[in-house]
Regions:
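Hydrophobic alpha-helical connector segments
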Residues: 68, 82-112, 165-168
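Helix-loop "lid/cap" segments that line or gate small-molecule binding pockets
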Residues: 84, 100-108, 116-123, 197-201
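N-terminal intrinsically disordered/low-complexity leader segments
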Residues: 1-18, 206-219
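Amphipathic alpha-helical segments used for helix-helix packing
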Residues: 94, 107-127, 144, 177
Length: 219
């Protein structure tokens, strides 16, 4: 008896609007579980409910699929984080909102794409790697620029903006390694506490008060 396709497979085969996105998400899940080298085109096609020939109708190659996954992850990040924080005029508030949205992005269903951007970027070669690196560098520049603005306005103390930007990224991008949705810390509380920890080390005493990093208080 033929196996009944899983609901996600049926949706993948019948809804052309979501088909490509579903392939990317299926491939992202497999690559997170098995690594890029350990995931074959056959694995992806089977998980997506397609033949290899059917899969190649949607992708050029395995490496190009990896590029598309990373671009998809960056697209999601820009939609759910950057598009909301770029219009914020106050640089400190912009940074705080950026951290909160970053944390929620990683903890609420997009950790696969973050994992692949972090761990599989070196697998890409040539123009593909340059394209992803350019997008990542734009985000680092955004953080450095926002930090520099906050220094100029006296909201945070003078610091090396590159060091601060990468410290910011180090905090938020590696959450997926240890955060568990079913654990004792809800995602919203985690975002608040990480804001307290990070910005308590940056804000001037005039803004931060005598004691920094109040327990559980949202920045």
């Amino acid at each position: 008896m033929a196996r009944t396709p899983k609901p996600e497979r049926r949706a993948l085969l019948t809804d052309p609007r979501d088909r490509h996105r579903a392939i990317l998400e299926t491939a992202a899940r497999l690559i997170c579980e098995k690594g890029y080298e350990g995931t074959s085109i056959h694995d992806i096609a089977e998980a997506a409910g397609l033949t290899k020939a059917g899969l190649y109708h949607h992708i050029r190659s395995k490496e190009h699929l990896l590029l598309e996954i990373q671009n998809y992850g960056m697209d999601v990040f820009e939609e759910k984080v950057l598009s909301h924080v770029l219009p914020i005029a106050d640089p400190l508030q912009r940074l705080k909102e950026c951290m909160e949205r970053n944390v929620l992005l990683v903890t609420q269903g997009w950790s696969k794409e973050v994992t692949i951007i972090l761990h599989e970027h070196a697998t890409l070669t040539g123009e593909a790697r340059a394209q992803i690196n350019a997008r990542k560098k734009r985000y680092v520049r955004f953080l450095e620029t926002s930090l520099a603005e906050a220094i100029r306005t006296g909201q945070i103390r003078p610091v090396n903006t590159k060091v601060a930007a990468f410290a910011f990224l180090g905090m938020v991008l590696w959450i997926y390694k240890w955060f568990r949705p079913e654990g004792a810390i809800p995602a919203e509380r985690l975002a608040s506490e990480m804001q307290d920890l990070f910005f308590a080390g940056l804000e001037t005493r005039a803004r931060g008060g005598g004691k920094r990093g109040g327990k559980g208080k949202k920045a």
